[in-house]
Each structure stands twice: as C-alpha cells, then as structure tokens.
C-alpha cells in the first residue's frame, strides 16, 4: 500500500480543465438560445418548452456522428468546422420529415482534455446550431484516460425537433409524375471518409496537393451544408411530397427510404456535373460508377420530390435561399424486378 495521497488529477482527469472549458463555451452556447429554452448551462437536465405555434406538435429525434472525417480533421489539426458537420448530420435528418430543430446536445470524449481543441470543436457546434436555428442546451465532456490515443477525441450529437402532425413529410404522398429537385452539396459532407482516406493512402497524394487551386484538405474538410432554413421556407410555400438526405448509402439506399413501394426515382445524370473532388476520387481510387453513387453524394446533398406544378416556385425559393438547385429527375411507376433508383 502506498502512502502517497492520490487525486483524480493523478489518475488523468482534470476537473479544473473541464470547468475552464465550460467557462470558455458559455458565450457560444448563449448565442444559440431559443425563447423556449428554460435555464442555462450546469443543470442536471435541459428544459425546453414546445413552441406555442404548433396545434398538434410531434417530436422528431435523431443522433449521429461524423464518421472517420474526424480522423482526417484530427490528423490535419482542423478542429473548427467538424462541429458544424456534427450538427448538420443530425438536423438534416430532421428537416427531411418537415421538423424544425429545437435543441441539440453533444458528446465529446477524449483521453486528455485539451481545452483549446475542445472549445474550437464546440464553437463549431454552436455555429451549426445557429445556422439551423436550434439551441445548444448541453452536452457531456468525458475525459477518459487510457481510452484514446494522445490527441484523439470522439464526437456524437443528438437533436430534437418538432413538426405539426398534419404536416409530417414521410413520402406517402409521392406519386408517379412527381418531379425530383436536387440541392447541391458542399463536398463529401460527412460520408465515405474511410474510402477517401484509403484513396489518399493508395494514391500517395498529399493533403496539401492542389485541386482547382485549393488544397485537397480544404475539399475534404469543407463543412457539411445545413439545409434547415432553406427547406423550412420551401415547405411553408410549396407542396413537398418527400425529401431524401444523401448520406451513407448514397443514391441507391437513401432515395428508396422515402418512396412508396410502387414507385421509382429516375435520375438524369446529365443534369449536373460532379464537383472536381469526386472525379479525383474516382480516378485516383479506380472506383466504379456504382460504388461512387453508393458511397458518396457526388454533389447532391438532398433530393426533393414534389408535384410538377410546384417546380418553378420551388426553384425560385431555393435560389433566393442561396441554394444551388436543379431538376434532377422524376418519379415513375416501378415495374416488376426494377430497382427503385435508376441513374440514366
């Protein structure tokens, strides 16, 4: 038995550093506040009232991470936008059902807490919350010695939103003849990064190598686009039948999630050009066309199904919101033995 008096800090957990982090992020948390939020940081739980404008409010929840994009961000010491990625992955999943994000919580885990790094990450989370109009109401910062390599950390996010029951978007309204509108992505968003890192490895490319005048690192770490405010505006003023968020599984797996069983999406491949980074990945990794569309968004962040009569209004609204939007295809009847997504 040792006579040495031990403390939690001796075991690798610095409570003072955790408290310092809380003080550092208070301003970031404050700027995301919504009127429905009750209380501030430090409570055992966060309190949030339902917005009064809803007659029959339905809560919608989602949780996500950023995959191995985080590995790239850590290796390149780029911590200030990965938080936006985290928020985007959660709130974009809510908005496709018509839900307005209300509040967000994060989980940040590391072996040894670096206050500067953590504060930078959480500032990015607050930025994402501000962009999507949801409140950052709390989170968990876990310092766990022996669980992570030096300098590593992990992230997860959880978001709750609300939608009027009569206005839920679930794909059941999709009909043959509907038009499909695409919303442009900002890059690979937060999916396919294990393959991206493999391509970097086998190609011998350096993240500082230039592509269209920008380092590869800038292309790969471009923060995931948040579509919340644009889509909220769209669904207020047009009839939207379905929205698919193109994440893991790409076109082949995400679009069918919002289609009735008797319909298929026919995508016109000539309606857009892949951003240069996707052509680079396909060439350097010798990746098949099918695999590209299964792994990456290839420049398309969202696909929206709506009646043909709404197309002109929808495109104008989306353009006013700053989105790159175009007609990418249509909904047709699904024949026997056919796939629910065709890319022609």
UniProtKB/Swiss-Prot annotation:
Keywords recorded for this protein, A-Z: ATP-binding, Cytoplasm, Ligase, Nucleotide-binding, Purine biosynthesis
GO molecular function: ATP binding; phosphoribosylamine-glycine ligase activity; phosphoribosylformylglycinamidine cyclo-ligase activity
GO biological process, one term: 'de novo' IMP biosynthetic process
Principal place of residence: cytoplasm
Enzyme's top EC category: ligase
Recorded metabolic or biological pathway in which this protein acts: Purine metabolism; IMP biosynthesis via de novo pathway; 5-amino-1-(5-phospho-D-ribosyl)imidazole from N(2)-formyl-N(1)-(5-phospho-D-ribosyl)glycinamide: step 2/2
Family named by the database record: Belongs to the AIR synthase family.
Protein name (database record): Phosphoribosylformylglycinamidine cyclo-ligase
């Amino acid at each position: 038995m040792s006579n040495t008096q031990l403390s939690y800090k001796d075991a690798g957990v610095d409570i003072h550093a955790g408290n310092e982090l809380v003080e550092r992020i208070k301003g970031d948390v404050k700027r995301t506040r919504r009127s429905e939020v009750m209380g501030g940081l430090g409570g055992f739980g966060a309190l949030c009232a339902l917005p009064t404008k809803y007659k029959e409010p339905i809560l919608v929840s989602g949780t996500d991470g950023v995959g191995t994009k985080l590995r790239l961000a850590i290796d390149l010491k780029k911590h200030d936008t990965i938080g936006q990625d985290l928020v985007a992955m959660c709130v974009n999943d809510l908005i496709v059902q018509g839900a307005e994000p209300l509040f967000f919580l994060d989980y940040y885990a590391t072996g040894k807490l670096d206050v500067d790094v953590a504060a930078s990450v959480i500032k990015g989370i607050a930025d994402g919350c501000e962009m999507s109009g949801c409140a950052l109401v709390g989170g968990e910062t876990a310092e766990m010695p022996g669980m992570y390599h030096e300098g590593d950390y992990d992230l997860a996010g959880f978001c709750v939103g609300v939608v009027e029951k009569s206005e839920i978007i679930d794909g059941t309204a999709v009909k043959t003849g509907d038009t499909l509108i695409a919303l442009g992505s900002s890059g690979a968003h937060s999916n396919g990064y294990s393959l991206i890192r493999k391509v970097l490895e086998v190609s011998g490319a350096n993240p500082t190598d230039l592509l269209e005048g920008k380092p590869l690192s800038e292309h790969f770490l471009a923060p995931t686009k948040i579509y919340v405010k644009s889509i909220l505006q769209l669904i207020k003023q047009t009839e939207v039948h379905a929205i698919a968020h193109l994440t893991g599984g790409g076109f082949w797996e995400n679009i069918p999630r919002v289609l009735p069983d008797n319909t298929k999406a026919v995508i016109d491949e000539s309606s857009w050009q892949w951003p240069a980074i996707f052509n680079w990945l396909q060439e350097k990794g010798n990746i098949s066309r099918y695999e590209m569309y299964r792994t990456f968004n290839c420049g398309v962040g969202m696909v929206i199904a709506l009646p043909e009569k709404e197309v002109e209004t929808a495109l104008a609204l989306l353009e006013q919101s700053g989105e790159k939007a175009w007609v990418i295809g249509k909904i047709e009847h699904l024949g026997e033995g056919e796939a629910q997504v065709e890319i022609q």
